[in-house]
Amino acid sequence: MASNSLMSCGIAAVYPSLLSSSKSKFVSAGVPLPNAGNVGRIRMAAHWMPGEPRPAYLDGSAPGDFGFDPLGLGEVPANLERYKESELIHCRWAMLAVPGILVPEALGYGNWVKAQEWAALPGGQATYLGNPVPWGTLPTILAIEFLAIAFVEHQRSMEKDPEKKKYPGGAFDPLGYSKDPKKLEELKVKEIKNGRLALLAFVGFCVQQSAYPGTGPLENLATHLADPWHNNIGDIVIPFN
């Protein structure tokens, strides 16, 4: 009996088409077949590093969750929710910052490093794309930003639903993407992935500027492409002289 069952399993594994008929004698062998639920669970179990166990508190339900938490920072549920929110907010800021750095430099209006030099001058006037910014002195801008950000953060902190704090919808969804739940979940994953890429890009801009002070990312890239063997990160990290 056992040998018959094993033979049935072996044949079914090699010739799965034999199971397609409801009259097949191999159906009674109870061979488990993959189904949509199993495939979904397999995808959910994707790890950030093969062989590393997924923490129990990272179950794959959050957008972009691949079980990455080597320091165990999210073990406390309240902290985990706060980190999710903080990551998303920082991702959105980075996605605004990276194009804001690249586009003006690409248009020939200077780089983001030199754009800050006015703030170091007494009575310096801020400009944007060559035009003076109204109320563009440093103390005035700091006061406006402090009041504006304080108001927005206060309003956001009053929301008790963690999902609404991250995805408020309403006026922040003018195209109505949140009306389709399936589409919304897909967009959440795309947002967090693009946001993480933008965070890495901004860190790269900062490192590049520290290595080559006064240069923007596009200028630095052009210099590297002109002579890749001599203009690279190794030229700074490894002291040749």
Curated annotation (Swiss-Prot):
The keyword Manganese does not apply. Chlorophyll a 2 binds at residue 90. GO terms for molecular function: chlorophyll binding; metal ion binding; mRNA binding; protein domain specific binding. The keyword ATP-binding does not apply. It is a multi-pass membrane protein. GO terms for biological process: photosynthesis, light harvesting in photosystem I; response to cold; response to high light intensity; response to low light intensity stimulus. Disulfide bonds: none annotated. Chlorophyll b 4 binds at residue 156. Keywords: Chlorophyll, Chloroplast, Chromophore, Magnesium, Membrane, Metal-binding, Phosphoprotein, Photosynthesis, Photosystem I, Plastid, Thylakoid, Transit peptide, Transmembrane, Transmembrane helix. Residues 1-35 form a transit peptide. Gene3D superfamilies: Chlorophyll a/b binding protein domain (1.10.3460.10). Chlorophyll b 3 binds at residue 153. InterPro entries: Chloro_AB-bd_pln, Chloroa_b-bind. Photoregulated by reversible phosphorylation of its threonine residues. Chlorophyll a 6 binds at residue 224. Binds at least 14 chlorophylls (8 Chl-a and 6 Chl-b) and carotenoids such as lutein and neoxanthin. It is found in: Plastid, Chloroplast thylakoid membrane. The chain crosses the membrane at residues 93-113, 132-152, 197-217. Light emission at 684 nm upon excitation at 410 and 470 nm. Belongs to the light-harvesting chlorophyll a/b-binding (LHC) protein family. The light-harvesting complex (LHC) functions as a light receptor, it captures and delivers excitation energy to photosystems with which it is closely associated. The LHC complex consists of chlorophyll a-b binding proteins. Red-emitting heterodimer with LHCA4. Interacts with LHCA5. This is Chlorophyll a-b binding protein 6, chloroplastic. It comes from Arabidopsis thaliana (Mouse-ear cress). The lineage of its organism: Eukaryota, Viridiplantae, Streptophyta, Embryophyta, Tracheophyta.
